[in-house]
């Protein structure tokens, strides 16, 4: 017990020092030129490509440990890096580099009758703490996005991706050095100890301005319950697709299979399929067969079970489950009203899609469902900052304060007011 207490003290002391250094780095970073930040990001991307072999070797260690632990295949997919994924990671950083620098942007401006000129201007948030689990690419995305927005960042990756994340972080540090920016602007917690998470949630004596958790329900719940600083919550992606009677069948089949099976382990993967009861004969069998043929397990409501014998019966637990695997729950609903009721009952407010040709159905879907991302005639797998033209994302925020949807460069800023006068005094 005494050893544990001493160990926690050591971790807390280390984290406080990391916080102090991050806060110190945030000051010059907030005023760094757009050109210097661009140079750092381009250099980071180049180093990542150059060190592909080192990153893959580190990832192999993480994969070996994960397989020995007996984790699910979907987890392995999220953890796995390949040459192609590393190239994509570098391309993502380059895309972030080419975004317009948000810092200093005048969001709005106006003149008062007394002659005062008021501007609302974008500013960095300061120091951001990012806590994530198995995806090593978050290291690159989060580091690059925070830098572009003029923020320092403290990264705490999961123990499962520890070696991969450290190898990627070394590339980011090298890019900062090349551009002459503080290397402490992007720091990674060098231990897998869970006490480090607890320390970050305290705010590190005022060093951390906001926490971004990216991971499973238990991680996000812990952060929301214990954090003493603001949180951009990235909840589970319990995403729905509703196929209306007015939908084009071939389009519906293509979108449904892509939304579920393109990458089953990402938060934008569809987890529940809702089919308009009025068009069950037209859609049910073709859609379910397409999913099964693609290797997906379908868990169906009782009224769908007769369409394809042998399907597993869905329970209430299924409607509340983010599978992150080749599994989907499916049911018939009473048109758009039934779809809205189901989604508003079970959704995690992440992403929902409607496949329909009836404009009235689409309008009701968009106006009566309050999730962060709503799509019409498109796959839920477009729920991604890169696909939104943001260059990347730290996560998909499902709350309603400050940031919502993909958390990109713009969402990682705050604002201040600049007021210009000519000698005015208040009467």
UniProtKB/Swiss-Prot annotation:
| The reaction(s) this protein catalyses | L-glutamate 5-semialdehyde + phosphate + NADP(+) = L-glutamyl 5-phosphate + NADPH + H(+)
Listed EC numbers: 1.2.1.41
What's the protein here called?
Gamma-glutamyl phosphate reductase
What PROSITE patterns does the entry give?
Answer: PROA
Outline what the protein does: Catalyzes the NADPH-dependent reduction of L-glutamate 5-phosphate into L-glutamate 5-semialdehyde and phosphate. The product spontaneously undergoes cyclization to form 1-pyrroline-5-carboxylate.
Main EC class the enzyme belongs to: oxidoreductase
Print the keywords alphabetically.
Answer: Amino-acid biosynthesis, Cytoplasm, NADP, Oxidoreductase, Proline biosynthesis
MF term (GO), any: glutamate-5-semialdehyde dehydrogenase activity
Q: Which family does it belong to?
A: Belongs to the gamma-glutamyl phosphate reductase family.
What biological processes does GO assign it?
L-proline biosynthetic process
Q: Where in the cell is it found?
A: Cytoplasm
Give the pathway annotation.
Amino-acid biosynthesis; L-proline biosynthesis; L-glutamate 5-semialdehyde from L-glutamate: step 2/2
Q: Which organism is it from?
A: Rhizobium meliloti (strain 1021)
- Record's GO cellular component terms: cytoplasm
